[in-house]
């Protein structure tokens, strides 16, 4: 399993505005699995990145909302 950081907007019908970007952390096998897990939400997904090593540790230490959802 890997942890993915998902950058998204709350409404997929609106134009993306950088200042409104939100993030969520999801644990899954692949990016595709994470996308399937989130498909029923009304999110406009901008970008998904896999967190590993030092990057993952940094997010754990410095993110005020590091709560991981499980995509399974």
From Swiss-Prot:
Keywords for the protein's UniProt record, in alphabetical order: DNA-directed RNA polymerase, Nucleotidyltransferase, Transcription, Transferase
Catalytic activity: RNA(n) + a ribonucleoside 5'-triphosphate = RNA(n+1) + diphosphate
Keyword Nucleotidyltransferase: yes
Pfam families: RpoY (PF07288)
A cellular-component GO term for this protein: DNA-directed RNA polymerase complex
Enzyme Commission designation: 2.7.7.6
GO molecular function terms noted in the UniProt entry: DNA binding; DNA-directed RNA polymerase activity
Domain of life of the source: Bacteria
Record has Signal as a keyword: no
Gene3D superfamilies in alphabetical order: RNAP, epsilon subunit-like
Signal peptide as annotated in the record: none
InterPro entries documented for this protein: RpoY
GO BP terms, alphabetized: DNA-templated transcription
Enzyme class: transferase
Entry similarity comment: Belongs to the RNA polymerase subunit epsilon family.
Function: A non-essential component of RNA polymerase (RNAP).
Description of how the protein assembles with itself and partners: RNAP is composed of a core of 2 alpha, a beta and a beta' subunit. The core is associated with a delta subunit, and at least one of epsilon or omega. When a sigma factor is associated with the core the holoenzyme is formed, which can initiate transcription.
Protein name as it appears in the record: DNA-directed RNA polymerase subunit epsilon
Native organism: Staphylococcus epidermidis (strain ATCC 35984 / DSM 28319 / BCRC 17069 / CCUG 31568 / BM 3577 / RP62A)
């Amino acid at each position: 399993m890997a942890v993915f950081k998902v950058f998204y907007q709350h409404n997929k019908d609106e134009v993306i505005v950088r200042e409104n970007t939100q993030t969520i952390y999801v644990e899954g096998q692949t990016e595709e699995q994470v996308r399937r897990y989130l498909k029923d939400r009304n999110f406009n997904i901008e970008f998904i990145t896999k967190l590993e090593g030092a990057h993952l540790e940094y997010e754990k230490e410095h993110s005020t909302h590091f709560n991981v959802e499980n995509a399974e």
